[in-house]
């Protein structure tokens, strides 16, 4: 649709990937798909999802060395077929759950491996992208939030950027609009953390401190009025009361508040309109929002399976 609306080639909008069969194998079916598209001018990415203790060594050092070798192999293939000269490294390494055989996304070894690969990318002067911001939890919960932040924060500190897959749960089996609202709150907090703070004559506030004096209060100063909105993050769902006031207001948790917000949004009239081809080319992200909107409008308040959403 986008290609027809802009007069450009379909390959300009094409995106697809096949995956290595670790350890050290590019499967026959995947290779055939790769070649078929390449012969027609369509570039297909090659990904890795190595598991420590499963398709790679149980030690992180061993698994990382294997993943690096496979990434270099992929780079050589892309260079031979497409002339790619840039070296891109990324990491989606995670430990295999030895009790249940699960490929988990919310374990601490995952960001640890990603930070180590980021250091290797810096050594080789390569670009880097880490896989983060996911959860194994099946419902909106403390588990989900902790796992998403646990995997995103180390990459944010090491690389200066990270992402959270808003709304995804159970690795990527479930989409929840409730979790999406909670993830927006977590993302906003991480953005505030990443922004840091300025040290200037104004922000050091020596004059204001002298004005307030020992035992004084800064709340009613002009300096506080000028700066608190930009300096202090303002939560939309997080607690802003002590326990007694929270109980008097109904003892609602963050999940309760997110559910209320979701129901409020869904109760509003649907104002979605059909876009012209020009609007599609100008605002391609609108299509992604419409896909999410279609998921939310199915009537499932808590969760929507990603397979149905596609």
Label for each model-derived stretch:
Residues 56, 62, 172-173, 180, ...:
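Flexible, active-site-adjacent loop/turn segments at secondary-structure boundaries
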Residues 1-161:
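Helix-rich catalytic cores of soluble enzyme domains
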Residues 114-219:
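Hydrophobic alpha-helical bundle architecture
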Residues 178-310:
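Catalytic-core signal marking the mid-to-C-terminal active-site face
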Residues 51, 94-97, 128-132, 163-173, ...:
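Short acidic (Asp/Glu) and glycine-rich catalytic loops that position anionic groups and cofactors
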Residues 8-11, 47, 82-90, 125-131, ...:
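Flexible, glycine/charged-enriched surface loops at secondary-structure junctions
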């Amino acid at each position: 649709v986008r290609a027809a609306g802009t007069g450009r080639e379909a390959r300009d909008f094409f995106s697809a990937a096949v995956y290595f069969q670790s350890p050290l194998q590019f499967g026959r079916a995947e290779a055939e798909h790769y070649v078929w598209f390449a012969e027609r001018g369509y570039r297909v990415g090659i990904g890795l999802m190595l598991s420590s203790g499963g398709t790679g060594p149980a030690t992180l050092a061993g698994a990382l060395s294997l993943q690096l070798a496979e990434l270099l192999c992929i780079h050589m293939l892309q260079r031979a077929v497409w002339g790619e000269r840039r070296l891109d490294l990324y990491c989606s390494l995670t430990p295999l759950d030895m009790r249940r055989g699960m490929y988990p996304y919310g374990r601490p070894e995952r960001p640890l491996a990603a930070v180590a690969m980021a250091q290797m990318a810096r050594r080789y002067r390569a670009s880097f992208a880490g896989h983060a911001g996911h959860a194994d939890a099946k419902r909106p919960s403390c588990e989900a939030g902790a796992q998403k932040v646990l995997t995103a924060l180390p990459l944010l500190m090491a690389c200066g950027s990270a992402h959270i897959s808003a709304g995804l749960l159970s690795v990527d089996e479930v989409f929840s609009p409730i979790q999406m609202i909670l993830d927006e709150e977590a993302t906003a907090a991480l953005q505030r953390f990443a922004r840091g703070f300025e040290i200037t004559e104004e922000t050091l506030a020596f004059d204001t401190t002298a004005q307030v004096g020992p035992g004084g209060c800064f709340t009613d100063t002009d300096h506080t009025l000028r700066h608190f909105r930009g300096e202090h993050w303002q939560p939309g769902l997080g607690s802003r009361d002590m326990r007694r006031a929270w109980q008097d207001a109904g003892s609602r948790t963050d999940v309760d508040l997110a559910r209320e917000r979701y129901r409020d949004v869904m109760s509003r009239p649907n104002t979605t309109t059909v876009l012209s081809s020009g609007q599609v080319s100008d605002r391609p992200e609108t299509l992604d929002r419409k896909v999410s909107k279609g998921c939310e409008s199915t009537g499932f308040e808590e969760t929507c399976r990603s397979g149905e959403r596609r």
